Amino acid sequence: LFGLLLLASGPGFRSRRQLDEHYQKHGFEFGSISEGDYLRLAQELRDAPPGGPILEARRPDGEFSRFDRRHGYFGAYNRDGTIRTFFIPNNGERYFRRQASRPYN
């Protein structure tokens, strides 16, 4: 199933282990969803066009983060589109803005 999701929807996490770890840590924040649903939501945020309710911040190295104002979802992504993390921050948009303003190393 994971392989099918990966092929059908583009990159996921860098490894199955990373997906498992992030789902275990953050999956409950999204209610009663499966690991596949968690992955799909992270991919949908990554693939949504920025603008309107979808905020985006890009770093010089190509990494980027997104925040969905409608649902409070935050995602951070590598340059190649693989998912770094996906969760619902306690401080919502403030968290996104704070991350976006952090200096690039």
Regions found by a protein language model. Give the residues of each.
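Compact soluble domain cores
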Residues: 7-62
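Short non-domain terminal segments
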Residues: 11, 28, 62-65, 72, ...
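A short, surface-exposed interaction/processing loop segment used at functional sites
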Residues: 75-105
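Short alpha-helical interface elements
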Residues: 44-48, 63-67, 91, 101-102
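Aromatic side chains
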Residues: 13, 22-23, 38, 67, ...
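Short, glycine/alanine-rich hydrophobic alpha-helices that insert into or span membranes
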Residues: 1-7
